[in-house]
């Protein structure tokens, strides 16, 4: 196997990884501490003095974490026994074994960025679970819900579009169906712009009707493998026997508006018979500010169902029905909130890898998935995506992301360098997007 390049890390002063560790992560921790402060009276109402003491304890643990980060202290093992604690601590030992540092300790700015950023969110969770009776509290819940509420007009526009489309779907010829599929894929792509971890937890909602912007946004799609997705799924549809299934898996990213765009796409896949089942993979714990948990998934469907617009509530009712019928299935697994790159999945989570192998197509949403797919490494821009996956090929897969990290592979020779010369922030601003496919053609 070819030599893999070094990991992105905070060692590179001025890099996006460096600025994330130096500025964005402390900002997120400060916001989490503030959120706990603001819920003090709620904790008192629900749990009395015990709730207030728990809030103080959680804040103290989080303040300690912020100090460790800002002073580049060694990264310490997790202490609270949880289902993944041992795996995390083994991974920390593994990272330490790779170091040349004189004291052999992993530190925030010298360890791989992917590891320390995941570790920070896992330590936030540890601070909460160490603080009963408020150990159920999702410190990011408010901002996820706000993102959904602030995107209402866009949600209504998408639900209306979908319901009108479903009415006429049987009359569409193959090219028209393909056009609609491409449209909803692009909506799911641009929905990925709404990422609260990039904005430091500040509002990042969708206030304009993305449907009307698709033509204008096309030049910003750097890699467009939508044709491969169409030919794969339309071929599955044509060759499917009566009782057989076509499974599309969506490895989710953000809750709120982006999740709505993913559910709209999933609805279309069933209505068009391009798929017979859609499986969603989310996070087991609150993660990267806006990532989807089972609570977020169920909450959002409930909100859409009770929306004050007939097509919106029709979508919500349909989605609830899909879940009941088993046509939509939500899964979570601890692997998605571990620091490992995905090429380690067969060893670390063989059960999950075996599950993914049952898919006809896996859609990986967003930046964190892309970073884990490619190992978050300093790849050359023109390295083939298949190579950067480093042996991770459970099923045909496609990554759908707007670029918000200094990693991108599979570009034409010179394309990345050209963008870098004209627009230095091209790969971190969320302005550009990709549909990047790996699988049989």
Curated annotation (Swiss-Prot):
Domain notes: Subfamily III proteins have a conserved RTxK motif about 40-50 residues from the C-terminus; the threonine may be replaced by serine or cysteine.
Family statement drawn from the similarity comment of this UniProt entry: Belongs to the damage-control phosphatase family. Sugar phosphate phosphatase III subfamily.
Protein residues bound to substrate: 253-254, 367-371, 404
Binding site for Mn(2+): 253-254, 291
Enzyme Commission number: 3.1.3.-, 2.1.1.-
Gene giving rise to this polypeptide: ARMT1
Residue intervals passing through the bilayer: none
Protein name (Swiss-Prot/TrEMBL): Damage-control phosphatase ARMT1
GO cellular component terms, semicolon-separated: nucleus
Annotated catalysed reactions: beta-D-fructose 1-phosphate + H2O = D-fructose + phosphate; beta-D-fructose 6-phosphate = dihydroxyacetone + D-glyceraldehyde 3-phosphate; L-glutamyl-[protein] + S-adenosyl-L-methionine = [protein]-L-glutamate 5-O-methyl ester + S-adenosyl-L-homocysteine
Modified residues (Phosphoserine): 102
Cofactor(s) essential for the protein: Mn(2+); Ni(2+)
Binding site for S-adenosyl-L-methionine: 258, 291
PTM-bearing positions, type N-acetylalanine: 2
PTM info: Automethylated.
